[in-house]
Amino acid sequence: MVDPTADDALDATARIARDLIRFDTTNYGEGKSNGEADAAEYVAAHLTRLGLEPEMFESEPGRVSVIARVEGTDRSKPALVVHGHTDVVPAQPDNWSVDPFEGVIKDGMLWGRGAVDMKNMDAMMLTALDDIQVAGKQPARDLVIAFFADEEAGGVLGSHYLVDTHPELFAGATEAISEVGGYSIHLNGARAYLLQTGEKTLVWVKLIARGTAAHGSHLMRDNAVTKLAEAVAAVGRRDWPIRLTDTTSQLLGELARILEVDPQKVGPDELAIATGTASRFIQASLRTTTNPTVLTAGYKHNVIPDTAEALVDIRTLPGEEDAVLAELAELVGPDIEILVLHRDIGLETEFAGPLVEAITGTLNTHDPGAAVLPYLLSGGTDNKALSRLGIKGYGFAPLKLPPEFDFPAMFHGVDERVPLDALVFGRRVLTDLLLNY
């Protein structure tokens, strides 16, 4: 009996993704990171073996991005950027059932930090290029292949750095594909794929409360921790109103049609919930979210600190960020300082055009009859940086998933994993798209 975990039994996509997971490229944020250098050298070596000439760009020591260009048969066509990132968010090993950086193969899945975010797509990019070379073919247009650093901290040292300092790398490109789209969901017994055509605005803020330092036994009304706790509770409990963007309106209309319900009688949240596990993303795309994520205060049990801080991850619908920040100031009150640490734009592009048609056609070739639907991502990607060069970005990392697989829960979650069969599917779909578009 063949061992399904043996190297010769694994698709090359799984082997490469496993190798990449074994590079601990943890990005802790606020400038703290293990760096991407080892992973960057790995992908650069692979690209070199394919006869390409990858360039490595180091924005700060250890923070390395890799870019290569694949020449197409018709260079008059606009180039397509195909990009991934090699950094990952932290993982707490004690919470996992496997070592998050071992790249364990079990239960028909590849486990590890980055298995879906997004070393799976990094691997699919490399094996798709392998397949194109083995076939002795060229893509129809130039491809700009990018492996960015620092996406998990907003891309300041990765995609934004390259857009600022080396925009010529993306010369001639008008469109891009990357993560968090192209994955399947199940609706009314049928499969559909969500193509990401928009992203929410990103605002990361720090709340700072100040008070009076004192002995822990004192009666203290001017307590920084109490002030911060009240502010954090107000922010976290705020239920922001639903507003439908063009993308979300189109998605909900298609969901109502597939589910055979009257959209006038079924609300947006109900339609989102009907998408199953994808509702984690879709419900969040209906409204702004403000989630406190980190609290910092104090240094000893019996000392009242004079400062307390909280980090809040704000994702607004495109165009709402200024109004949300103004309301945030009202929510926390005048005693709380709001420091904006990072801010990036929201995106929304049309669900139409030759690339969307090519994606839909390629998916239908590999999964006949499946619907392809647009959606607004509740998070963000490096497409934000590329948009500054006029490049329209889409989320398309194709994966055909089991109905019960909670894909959104894998992002930044415990026991992150991806089905091996989905990687094989993604490789085939991506290869065909890159060859024929």
How should each PLM-predicted stretch be described?
Residues P78-L80, T174-A176, G393-Y394:
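Structural motif
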Residues K106-D117, A370-L373, V414-D415:
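Short pre-catalytic strand/loop immediately N-terminal to key active-site residues, enriched for Gly-Thr
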Residues N27-Y28, V88-V89, D150-A153, G182-I185, ...:
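Solvent-exposed loop/turn segments at secondary-structure junctions
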Residues V2-R113, I132-R141, V312:
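Acidic/His- and Gly-rich active-site-bordering loop/insert found
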Residues R18-T25, T48, L52, D130, ...:
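Sec-exported extracytoplasmic/periplasmic mature domains
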Residues M1-V2, D8, G181-R191, L195-R427, ...:
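Metal-dependent amide/peptide-bond hydrolase catalytic core
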Residues L110, V116-L194:
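Acidic/histidine-rich catalytic neighborhood of metal-dependent amide-processing enzymes
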Residues H83-H85, F147, I177-E179, I208-R210:
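Short beta-strand segments
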